[in-house]
C-alpha cells in the first residue's frame, strides 16, 4: 500500500467517526463527547491495526502493520498537526501546509467529508447504513443500534471492522 492509500484510510476512519449526518435518520455520536476506538483495516491481502485515543485536547491516531512495515502516528490538536511516519516527523499549523503536503491532503479530506455531504443514510431494522462514494469507490458504513460504527467497506478491496468503540 502506498502512502496515499494509507492516508485515505486514515481520512476515512477519522471522518466517518467525526462527521455529522445530512438527515435525521442516522444521528452520529455527539461530538461534544469523547470516543476512542480500535479497528482492523483489511486492504486486499494486507491488514493494519488502528487505534484512536483522546489525550487531553488532542486526538492521537496510531497505525501499525503486523510486519511493522508501517508505523504512523497522526496528532490533530485544534489548528495544529503532527505526523510521524516511520520515524520522520512533520508538524505545524494546518492552515500553513502547502497544497502538495500529505498532511494538507489529510486536513482537506477531513474537512470535506466531515460536512456529511455525499453520503445517504437509511435505517434497516436496528441498523443504520450509509452509502456513498469515497475516492472513486463505493462506500458503505454500518452502525449498530446505538448508532456507533461497526463496519466500513470501500469498493471491493477495503474493509474496516471496529473491535471497540467507546465513550471516554
Q: Over which residues does each language-model region extend?
A:
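Start-of-domain marker
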Residues: 33, 44-46, 50-53, 58-59
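Bacterial N-terminal signal peptides that target proteins for export
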Residues: 1-7
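Flexible, processing/modification-adjacent segments and terminal tails
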Residues: 27-31, 35-39, 83-137
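C-terminal motif of bacterial Sec signal peptides marking the signal peptidase cleavage site
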Residues: 17-20
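Gly/Pro-enriched, hydrophobic low-complexity segments
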Residues: 60-65, 72, 117-168
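Bacterial signal peptide processing site
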Residues: 22-24
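An acidic-aromatic
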Residues: 52-108, 112, 158-159
Amino acid at each position: 500500500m502506498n502512502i496515499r492509500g494509507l492516508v485515505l484510510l486514515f481520512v476515512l476512519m477519522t471522518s466517518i467517526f467525526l462527521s455529522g449526518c445530512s438527515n435525521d435518520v442516522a444521528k452520529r455520536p455527539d461530538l461534544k463527547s469523547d470516543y476512542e476506538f480500535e479497528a482492523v483495516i483489511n486492504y486486499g491481502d494486507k491488514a493494519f491495526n488502528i487505534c484512536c485515543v483522546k489525550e487531553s485536547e488532542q486526538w492521537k491516531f496510531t497505525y501499525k502493520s503486523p510486519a511493522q512495515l508501517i508505523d504512523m502516528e497522526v496528532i490533530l490538536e485544534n489548528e495544529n498537526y503532527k505526523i510521524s511516519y516511520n520515524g520522520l516527523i512533520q508538524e505545524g499549523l494546518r492552515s500553513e501546509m502547502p497544497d502538495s503536503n500529505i498532511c494538507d491532503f489529510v486536513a482537506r479530506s477531513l474537512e470535506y467529508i466531515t460536512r456529511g455531504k455525499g453520503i445517504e443514510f437509511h435505517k434497516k431494522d436496528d441498523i443504520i447504513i450509509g452509502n456513498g462514494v469515497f475516492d472513486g469507490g463505493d462506500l458503505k458504513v454500518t452502525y449498530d443500534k446505538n448508532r456507533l460504527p461497526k463496519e466500513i467497506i470501500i469498493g471491493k478491496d477495503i474493509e474496516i471492522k471496529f473491535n471497540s468503540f467507546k465513550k471516554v
